[in-house]
Design a protein with these regions (language model features):
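Substrate-positioning beta->alpha
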Residues: 162-171, 182-205, 212
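N-terminal Rossmann NAD(P)H-binding glycine-rich loop of SDR-like oxidoreductase domains
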Residues: 3-23
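C-terminal amphipathic/interface module of NAD(P)-dependent oxidoreductases
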Residues: 238, 257-291
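Conserved Rossmann-fold NAD(P)-dependent oxidoreductase catalytic core, especially the SDR/UDP-sugar
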Residues: 88-128
């Protein structure tokens, strides 16, 4: 396949690009403000918020749109420039160069759900960050329909792995004794190892699964405290204490704390019909990083 990966310098994007290359695919990747160490990738230096960038005159079998600001970006205007305006600019550059776009989103689009979330659950975002991301998704979905382009979306749980927030915000802080959970940490979360996130994206592309949505997280329900405590036990650190929500919001921002502390349980039945998880539980995933 000929493939374009936006955000190819990022946590998921870099691993996806490497995996695609290792399987013999021709990979182009947009990079912005992060040097790439990926050999054999055709690098496109592009700031998607500036519509002056150019995409090579190539017919891509699939475009993976992963470039995005995270909830750690507190500036709402910057979020919109990157996550919405950047998506619009990208589509205008690729609408004649591909027949399939895969969009990476998150479980936050389901807001504060009642019961178990699956692909039929109502979309009801309750943070500005997620509302912007959903606006970008709707733009892509509508524009793809108008231009006869296949579109699929993967709603990922919290993606963790070596070199991610998991190491910087959990492992290192546990080791230093500085780790705190917002509140008691007793809210159910849905996690997915980055290798499985990459595997799912690959499977959707290789099987040409167009015009689909997938809820993507491993099969184990766990509270955030249980996740952090298991990590602490693996590295021989003390269990983290909690801090009041208002203090957590002051440090991390309201959107991130709301996304982190909203309880979430999912069914991964649909994606499990087309993809076999490498790490069916968070314990196996954490072990793969820390052992």
């Amino acid at each position: 396949m000929k493939v374009l990966v936006t955000g190819a310098g990022g946590f998921i994007g870099s691993r996806l690009a490497n995996r695609l290359i290792s399987e013999g695919h021709e990979v182009y990747g947009t990079i912005h403000n992060s040097p790439s160490q990926i050999e054999e990738m055709q690098i496109i230096n592009a700031d998607l918020t500036n519509d002056g960038f150019e995409i090579p005159d190539v017919k891509f079998d699939v475009v993976f749109h992963l470039a995005a600001a995270t909830p750690l970006t507190k500036d709402k205007k910057k979020q919109k420039r990157i996550n919405y305006d950047g998506t619009v600019n990208l589509f205008n550059k690729i609408k004649d160069k591909t027949e399939f776009i895969i969009y990476a989103s998150g479980l936050g689009v389901f807001g504060d759900p009642n019961g178990t979330v699956d692909e039929q659950s109502p979309i009801k975002p309750d943070t500005d960050f997620v509302k912007i991301r959903l606006d970008a998704q709707k733009f892509l979905e509508d524009s793809c329909k108008e231009n006869n382009i296949g579109f699929s979306v993967c709603y990922f749980g919290d993606v963790y792995g070596d070199g991610s927030w998991f190491v910087e915000m959990v492992v290192k802080k546990l080791k230093s004794g500085m780790m705190k959970t917002p509140g008691k940490g007793d809210y159910d979360k849905c996690f997915i190892h980055v290798d499985d996130a990459v595997g799912i994206l690959m499977e959707v592309a290789k099987n040409n699964l167009k015009n689909q949505s997938y809820v993507c997280a491993d099969s184990t329900s766990v509270t955030f405290k249980e996740f952090v405590d298991y990590t602490a036990d693996k590295i021989g650190a003390k269990h983290a204490g909690g801090i009041p929500m208002f203090l957590a919001k002051g440090v991390l921002g309201g959107d991130l704390v709301k996304l982190l502390t909203t309880p979430m349980k999912i069914s991964n039945k649909k994606i499990s019909e087309v993809y076999k998880f490498i790490y069916p539980s968070y314990k196996e995933g954490i072990n793969s990083i820390l052992d």
